Amino acid sequence: MIQVFSERKDKPVQYGFVDLGGAPLPNEVDYPTVEFSTSPDGINWTSAYDVKNMENVHCYSSPNVPVAKKTNQTKKIGFQDGERIVSTSFDSRELKFKLVYKGVSQTDAMLAFESAQRFLVSREAYWITFADWLGRMYYGTAVMGDPEFSVNDWTCEVTFTDLMGLSRSIGTSLSPVEDEWGVNNNVPNNGDYPPYTFKENKFSVYNLSDIYIDPERQGHQLKIVVKGAAGDNFQIKNLTTGDYIKRPKGFSGTWELDGVNPTLNNEGDLLNITGTHGGVITLNNGKNDFQVDNFSGEISFDFPFWRLS
């Protein structure tokens, strides 16, 4: 399990009704709060609530549902009317959220802003996620607008540039479902979460992303791990896309296809491989039917899910 958010029991919350003559609890505030965390690698996370010098710095307005910005590369075909799409890519986009600080002195307010800036502003891109949009993370960099000070308080708008133009699941297809798959995740209509480890030679792999998975042209992560024994002409074929990868010579042990790089028992295996584009497997959106020839053992598919929002 990946620990994304703080384990504190006293996280800031907006208070509700208070008994006559009563007072809010120390962790209750008069505005909504949304926890957010950052990570350099998508695995090791730091919540803003766990940064000591950001005490009382809260996100009170998280980003709206991000809009996907698509660009089509088109080409004129002979004398045909119009144009045809050659390729499609998603452009970077901006996610805006707002911070608020309420303190006891102007000095504390300035120090809190400095700490927030250190937490969010970096030369290097990183991942960010928000607790009200579970299971999704965005990769990019942030800039902070000028703070609006009011005695001991301030508010500030943060602009995060999502460099990929898509969100990614924090977990992968092999992660525990309840931990990292997120909400609104394209699970099939029967509501059952599909498996991604198989012992059969015919099975279906569900790509729950909003886009197809293409390790070669898009650099998407896709690791196929085969453990067992294979005879000559071992082959994995995606019957839905027509992609296949083939190894003429048999083997035993662990064979992996990590993106476009095949290995056998941790040794490079590219020279022994044939197939689509030299042995590349892609996944369509939704259901992909697979067939594995001349193999006995276990095969798993490990990849993150990509969302438009």
Regions found by a protein language model. Name each.
Residues 89-93, 120-122, 150-154, 216-218, ...:
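Solvent-exposed loop and beta-edge segments used for protein-protein assembly and interaction
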Residues 2-7, 174-309:
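Intrinsically disordered, low-complexity segments enriched in serine, threonine, and glycine
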Residues 109-117, 156, 172-176:
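"Short basic amphipathic alpha-helical interaction patches in structured regions
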Residues 79-107, 152-166, 288:
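Oligomerization/assembly interface segments of phage tail-like spikes and tubes
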Residues 122-169:
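Short beta-strand and beta-hairpin "edge-sheet" elements
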Residues 48-99, 112-117:
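Glycine/small-residue-rich interface belts in oligomeric ring/scaffold proteins
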Residues 1-73:
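Polar/acidic, low-complexity leader/linker segments enriched in S/T/G and N/D
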Residues 100-127:
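Structured, non-membrane catalytic/scaffold regions adjacent to prosthetic-group chemistry
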